[in-house]
Amino acid sequence: MEKSRQFDLAPYIDHAALDPATTREAIATCCAQALHHKFVAVCVYPSALSQAVELLRGKKVEICAVIGFPSGASTSGSKLYEAQEAAELGATELDVVINLGLLKDGNTEAVYNDIAPIVEATGLTVKAILEMGRLTESEKRLAAEICLDAGVQYLKTSTGWGKGATVADVRLLHQISQGRVGIKASGGIRTVEQAIALIEAGATRLGTSRGVELIQQQQQLWEQG
């Protein structure tokens, strides 16, 4: 309980609305919740950007679009187009899934060229999603180094569509990046205790669709004294 007093979770939360069946009503709710709780960002599909931008225009909430999500297996050209279109629609941040197949093939140049043009062309905050639950220890390190070289601003653990964030993976990314970029933990974050453990390991953002639940849990702990 004491640790729950040390962190206000709201400024860490990227409030996600990434169910494939997400409706306009759900996007409106997501944006309203982000405003009410002062979350740092909402995270949506590109098709929901216009609505999110309209609802959050002039507000202190970042608008993040996912790119190549969730597989990362789109062509590099299509990812670049998707990213540029998202930027034109008003996204302020991009969560881009790397190509895991290229990484596992050892084609490091292609992995770099899948990400770097997006960073350069859009000028937005780019978070590279490594999907660490699918990688070996050496692949995790390699993926992180490639993305750092590509100029991303964040390393992100997972899409949330597989194995979610672990303290060990966040700690590894923090060790590799040495403070050069932010770390976003995402996937399976359901409790305040999990959230705090990830922050203590080095996470600077938490990607979750359960942001409101986490805030409610934390408020209950505060009220219990």
UniProtKB/Swiss-Prot annotation:
The first-level EC class reads lyase
Keyword match Cytoplasm: yes
The entry's localization annotation reads: Cytoplasm
Question: Which GO BP terms sit in this record?
Answer: 2-deoxyribose 1-phosphate catabolic process; carbohydrate catabolic process; deoxyribonucleotide catabolic process
One GO MF term: deoxyribose-phosphate aldolase activity
Q: Which residues form the active site?
A: 95 (proton donor/acceptor), 156 (schiff-base intermediate with acetaldehyde), 184 (proton donor/acceptor)
Q: InterPro entries of this UniProt entry?
A: Aldolase_TIM, DeoC, DeoC/FbaB/LacD_aldolase, DeoC_typeI
Query: Known SUPFAM superfamilies for this protein?
Result: Aldolase
* A Pfam family it matches: DeoC
List the catalytic activities from the record: 2-deoxy-D-ribose 5-phosphate = D-glyceraldehyde 3-phosphate + acetaldehyde
UniProt pathway annotation: Carbohydrate degradation; 2-deoxy-D-ribose 1-phosphate degradation; D-glyceraldehyde 3-phosphate and acetaldehyde from 2-deoxy-alpha-D-ribose 1-phosphate: step 2/2
Matching Gene3D superfamilies: Aldolase class I (3.20.20.70)
Alphabetized UniProt keyword annotations: Cytoplasm, Lyase, Schiff base
Gene Ontology terms, cellular component aspect?
Answer: cytoplasm
Q: Which family does it belong to?
A: Belongs to the DeoC/FbaB aldolase family. DeoC type 1 subfamily.
| HAMAP family registered for this protein in UniProt | DeoC_type1 (MF_00114)
The record's section on NCBIfam families has: deoC (TIGR00126)
The protein's name in its UniProt record: Deoxyribose-phosphate aldolase
- Annotated source species: Synechocystis sp. (strain ATCC 27184 / PCC 6803 / Kazusa)
| Gene name per UniProt | deoC
